Amino acid sequence: SMYDGGIEKIVNVCASVGGFQDTVDLMEKYPFIYGAVGIHPDDADKMTQETLDEIRRLSHMDKMVAIGEIGLDYYWHKEEEEHQIQKKMFRAQLDIAREEKLPFMIHSREAAEDTLNIVREYMQGGMYGGIIHCFSYSREIAAEYLKMGLYLGIGGVVTFKNAKKLKETVQYAPLSQLVLETDCPYMSPEPNRGKRNSSLNLPYVAQAIAELKGITAEEVIDVTRQNAEKLLGIHQ
């Protein structure tokens, strides 16, 4: 049903401690599914050296194309001590991305400044590119990431009426630095907002970007596919 819906390739992104095997199983079962391995900041306090070793080991798999979803989330985590643990684990996973020559996928919520500072520091030391997943900050912050040659992940939120900030960012950002994503099962685009999300909803996202940029949805789909393939080293 993915092919019929125009979806050629999917990157399934790990997030939780204990969730790696699900991604590995999907990658092995479906030729069109690739993986990203990493731990979301919500689980940073559950991470051990074994977790990091496992991320590194799985990153060697042929179809594992990125380290993610990694980053900082201060929305639910208000304590400075929690922030320190998140930053430590974020850096540890960026180290793996650098050493294994893989791009990263970043989650950042209510942590704009700290995320930007850490990413900037790593990019200056040389990295293999990355995606700021589900980008939600201002155009000014987008500009900083775009200057570093990073990509912005755009999902269902761009179709929401109240997503003024994101729409401005999408108008401003070059199409050559955007990729499409779902954040499944969350963030379903209009007209399916509130329902379980799936990759089959991506045409709505492409259409919204096309309208904001005054181009066709076909062009959005074509260019964002090429962007993702180039960054992630996935070839036809």
Regions found by a protein language model. Give the residues of each.
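Mid-domain alpha/beta scaffold segments of enzyme catalytic cores
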Residues: S1-Q236
